Amino acid sequence: MLTERLSIFIDAQNFYNGARRAFFTNQDSHVCGQFDPVSLGTLICSRPPADAVRSLEQVRIYTGRPDASKEPRTYAAHMRQCAAWESKGAIVIARALRYPAGWPETKPQQKGVDVALAIDFVTMAIDGQYDVGVIASTDTDLKPALEYVWRKLSTTRRVEVTNWTGSTVQRRLSVPGASIWCYWLKREDYDSIADPTDYNL
């Protein structure tokens, strides 16, 4: 049996927010919901569908990057977190946050993170850089990329998704008419890959 190369594509903010919705409240510390992306990839790789054998090829995590001049403390914390991810083998793809005219009363927004993830998911499939691509996000803007790889490359590439499952969270990315494997992650799964580090300190 051939070993399939698995790469996971993580939308950092979306997956963090999903963990908080599934397992925590707004009153919990901001570190609640943080996770180790490489541990996430290892966990996913260890739970393949029946009769599949997987090896972890890449862990790619996509994130918005604060402006160092506007939010120096937040920027420093972000860079420490990214350095921690990279030290364990993750590939970090960062895009600058967009600051609206009403900032700081209005929060900055991610810009281009989902586009970068979608482009990499498709181009890496076309280039044969993975056999199995897993998207860790519920952002519906990523559905076209998921659908493209499934429809055009399903004979050579497998697409899968993952999300947290709690008392109030049961969402996942899907493609109409497709049977796409989803790794549902429970609270005990989160606890096994949680990152309790406060990068502000």
Name each model feature, range by range.
Residues I91-L201:
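Nuclease catalytic cores that cleave nucleic-acid phosphodiester bonds
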